[in-house]
Amino acid sequence: MSTGKIAQVVGPVVDVAFATDDKLPEINNALVVYKDGDKSQRIVLEVALELGDGLVRTIAMESTDGLTRGLEVFDTGRAISVPVGKETLGRVFNVLGDTIDLDKPFAEDAERQPIHKKAPSFDDLSTSTEILETGIKVIDLLAPYLKGGKVGLFGGAGVGKTVLIQELIHNIAQEHGGISVFTGVGERTREGNDLYWEMKESGVIEKTAMVFGQMNEPPGARMRVALTGLTIAEYFRDVEGQDVLLFIDNIFRFTQAGSEVSALLGRMPSAVGYQPTLATEMGQLQERITSTKKGSVTSIQAIYVPADDYTDPAPATAFAHLDSTTNLERRLTQMGIYPAVDPLASSSRALSPEIVGQEHYDVATEVQHVLQRYRELQDIIAILGMDELSDEEKTLVGRARRIQFFLSQNFNVAEQFTGQPGSYVPVAETVRGFKEILEGKYDELPEDAFRSVGAIEDVVEKAKNMGV
């Protein structure tokens, strides 16, 4: 194990000098330094550049407070390695695989795997076309998720990305008994804490491993924490043969951390100040999130859209890797429609008759057609009023408004805030409900009866309670 000494510390960047006759550590190797020689105060550095003359530039995974020039640095001879396997379920980790919940730490001999790996080879990949039922009507009907696919949750600040992720974790664990890995990348510590306790109370935590590198962490940790979560998920897929759900909240923060690291390493910035290696870094992460013949990793990634600008390089680069997109729209939150999923902007390559079936496909496309026509008529309604519409158009507008409200529903994870019990709606029930609305079966019921309910029977029940 080669040993070097700290040459300089500039924020999270640490330069380490090795003797020129020593073997230099490889790129991505983990180096360890002990503050004041105290073995309990370990700081891990990751090699990023080799500068020549035995000097390497590293990025710290923790705060560099207390590091001084001349401190000894040890090369571990391998990349950062994190615990994997069933023991990770119900636990919370940081980027290094250290437990940060209040439970006992992992045994020294626990199985570990490096966070840097190659993507599965082409002949190991599987091409599954099975739908993953989420119980959320707007998703299951209009932008269904593929098992083993990649899903992007797009939206600006405060439109409900994290709540939607929490509901998906809840539904998958309760209804499918599936294993989930939640990776918090550069988001609020408070939200992570709330999520942990909510999942503990509901019992979902026993099926979930959680990895956090939050806003207060150095950029190196925020950049690598997604790989830590992915490594845990890959083990369940490749060794245990499981179908795993990988949640990443937020993939934009991964890009943002990469941009900070790139600037710290002195690279010339590219478009809008992002790192020149943006597409490469995104590709290295996304290509490992895939389904193999042994199991699958279905990833659901929250993607913050800066200033609601979808042409920004960060969300635009992520777009290229996705099978389904769920777009959250601020206009819908202002109308009180939750989840605020835009039914016309959201899309999925799974929405085809071969995958979802002819009836589902026909109902979904007709719903989109009605909503699109309603959007076109809104300008006329705003200027001239409803009276200028033909009877046929008035009927269409009435149905479109009922559909728009029926696409909303209460969430289980939001019950403590809304006081309303959440609902899980099977796909068959969802398709039947929208088909009957399109057929005009519920034209007489008030629009408010369709707001924030589960199945179509709940609409009828709500209308009765309203005295209709």
UniProtKB/Swiss-Prot annotation:
Recorded catalytic reaction(s): these are:
ATP + H2O + 4 H(+)(in) = ADP + phosphate + 5 H(+)(out)
Checking Gene3D superfamilies in the record gives: 2.40.10.170, Bovine Mitochondrial F1-atpase, Atp Synthase Beta Chain, Chain D, domain 3, P-loop containing nucleotide triphosphate hydrolases
User: Membrane topology per the record?
Assistant: Peripheral membrane protein
Q: Which organism is it from?
A: Streptococcus mutans serotype c (strain ATCC 700610 / UA159)
Where does the record say this protein resides? Cell membrane
- Which keywords label this protein? ATP synthesis, ATP-binding, Cell membrane, CF(1), Hydrogen ion transport, Ion transport, Membrane, Nucleotide-binding, Translocase, Transport
A GO CC term attached to the entry: proton-transporting ATP synthase complex
Name the principal localization, coarsely classed: membrane
| PROSITE patterns associated with the record | ATPASE_ALPHA_BETA (PS00152)
Family, per entry: Belongs to the ATPase alpha/beta chains family.
Name of this chain's protein: ATP synthase subunit beta
Please list every transmembrane segment annotated in the UniProt record, as residue ranges.
none
Query: In the record, what terms sit under GO molecular function?
Result: ATP binding; ATP hydrolysis activity; proton-transporting ATP synthase activity, rotational mechanism
The primary gene name is atpD
